[in-house]
Regions:
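Hot-dog-fold acyl-thioester-processing enzymes
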Residues: 1-72
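Hydrophobic alpha-helical context, especially transmembrane and signal-peptide helices
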Residues: 37, 43, 48, 79, ...
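Mid-chain, well-packed structural core segment of small domains
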Residues: 65-93
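Generic detection of short hydrophobic beta-strand segments and adjacent strand-loop junctions
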Residues: 9-15, 79, 126-128
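HotDog/MaoC-like acyl-thioester-processing domains
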Residues: 1-8, 85-131
Length: 131
C-alpha cells in the first residue's frame, strides 16, 4: 500500500455497559468509577465512565486494521485524556499520517478520539513500523 501525508482513517463504536464490564474482567481494573453505578453517580463524573485505556484501544483498531493496517507494529503511543466517555456514547477513533520516514518504514501518526458531539475525548501521537 502507498502511504501519504494526511492520509486518514476512522472507526466508530457505541460504548455499552457490557464493553466496560468485559474490559474490567480482562484488565482487572474494577475501579468503582467504571463498574459501580451508585458510587459513580456520586463522583465528579456523575455516572459510570469507560476506562481510558478501553477508549484508546480503538486507536489500535484503526492502526492494526485500517491505517496503516495489518502488519503494522506499534513502537510508541502518547495519550492525553480530555473528557470522560459514558455508557451510550458513540466514539470515533481517527488516525492521520503526519510524517513518513520512507527509508526506515516508520510513520508518525496523529491520533484522536471524539464523541457523538464531535468533542475530543482523547488525543495523542503514535509511532509505527509500516508493514
Amino acid at each position: 500500500m502507498n502511504y501519504y501525508l494526511n492520509q486518514s482513517q476512522s472507526f466508530s463504536k457505541t460504548i455499552t455497559e457490557y464493553d466496560i464490564y468485559t474490559f474490567a474482567g480482562i484488565s482487572g481494573d474494577f475501579n468503582p468509577i467504571h463498574v459501580n453505578r451508585e458510587k459513580a453517580k456520586d463522583s465528579i463524573f456523575s455516572g459510570q465512565i469507560a476506562h481510558g485505556i478501553l477508549v484508546s484501544s480503538f486507536i489500535s483498531t484503526v492502526i492494526g486494521m485500517y491505517l496503516p493496517g495489518p502488519g503494522t507494529i506499534y513502537l510508541k503511543q502518547t495519550l492525553n485524556f480530555r473528557k470522560p466517555v459514558y455508557i451510550g456514547d458513540t466514539i470515533t477513533a481517527s488516525v492521520s499520517i503526519k510524517e513518513i520516514e520512507e527509508n526506515k518504514k516508520i510513520a508518525k501518526l496523529y491520533t484522536i478520539v471524539t464523541n457523538q458531539n464531535n468533542l475530543m475525548v482523547l488525543d495523542g501521537e503514535a509511532v509505527v513500523k509500516l508493514p
